[in-house]
Amino acid sequence: LRVSSHLFIERNGRIVQFVGCGKRAWHAGVSRFNGRDNCNDFSIGIELEGTDFVAFEDEQYQALEKLLKAIDARYGLSYIVGHSDIAPGRKTDPGPHFDWVRLHSARSAFGSPQFAGAAARLQLSILEQSFVRA
């Protein structure tokens, strides 16, 4: 079974790391972004505990912002997208309750990545050109 993500943020903001960010995780599955297939090969997956129909906690957003800042410092962020943007029709997350406006407002703290796709998602795939494996 190939199911995993790099990082998971619990409702209380606790961060759990399942896979090192320099390794391949299996969060995206069959996916495509920016003309490239297999997003697991060049992305870092962050899962937020929740569902498509329940709002996320403030603690989760605070933890997400800290993670993005750390990932940007280490790898540099190029794009931030939801799983539904890279696997449309197959993935719905992060869902309509994800606060993309809040994330946009905080992005100066973690560089200036581009936001792509729809404005509401649960699992974030952080895509970056420098993380590509040959």
Stretches with model-predicted labels:
Residues L1-S78:
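Active-site-adjacent loop/helix surface patches within enzyme catalytic domains
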Residues D37, T51-A134:
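Basic/polar, cationic surfaces and motifs that engage anionic cell-wall
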